[in-house]
Amino acid sequence: MTDNIILEGLKSFGVEKAEDKAIVLSSYLDLVMSFNPSLKLVGEKERDEIARRHILDSASAYPVFLENTEAGDQIGDLGSGAGFPGIVLAILFPDRNFVLIDRMTRRIGFLRIVKAKLNLENVEILDKDVKDVKRNFRVITCRAFRPLAEIGDEVVALTSSAILYKAVEDNIEKELETLRFQGFVFNASILPVSIPGEKARRSIVVMKEWRKP
């Protein structure tokens, strides 16, 4: 079964082969719904609410990833949790490779189930704290993770580029200013996005040439 909410949302973001990808995302939502009562993956309980607030929210950055990444790129998802945005992006971009990083055992177990059930060959799962990861990524991403000022050193050890999901109520400019005060240099763009059916707005922060001289 395909959730119409997901399909229409993907179409609004300009996703290629939206119908096929909506089917896989609906199967992913089935797994979230099935395991959520025992694993407490997300706070919401209603299917449509999870579809909007987590799956479509994760998919909203599709145009940004399309523009800033390419086939074969390795993308790290910090604190992947239940797979938002990493699993969603892996479904939307089967030609990119996604490394999902989390240190909570129950979440890691769920991610492994999702990878197996959905045959996501472009997904790798790391059961590690971010600071212990020794890899180089084309770009990293994270959603509902820690403030930028708390992850600066960890990020620049992995990459110089990031695509970050931030709530509008987050004081993004203040977070960026704190990074500068800490000695980081970067080029940052703040892009507003909206989720069909959701009043809450989201910003995508694109960080380039992020480093600490």
Regions found by a protein language model. Give the residues of each.
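Conserved SAM-binding loop of SAM-dependent methyltransferases across substrates and taxa
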Residues: 82-95
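Class I SAM-dependent transferase core
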Residues: 2-76, 106-109, 113-123
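Residue-level signal for inorganic ion chemistry
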Residues: 32, 89, 207
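Conserved S-adenosyl-L-methionine
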Residues: 77-81
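S-adenosylmethionine
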Residues: 95-213
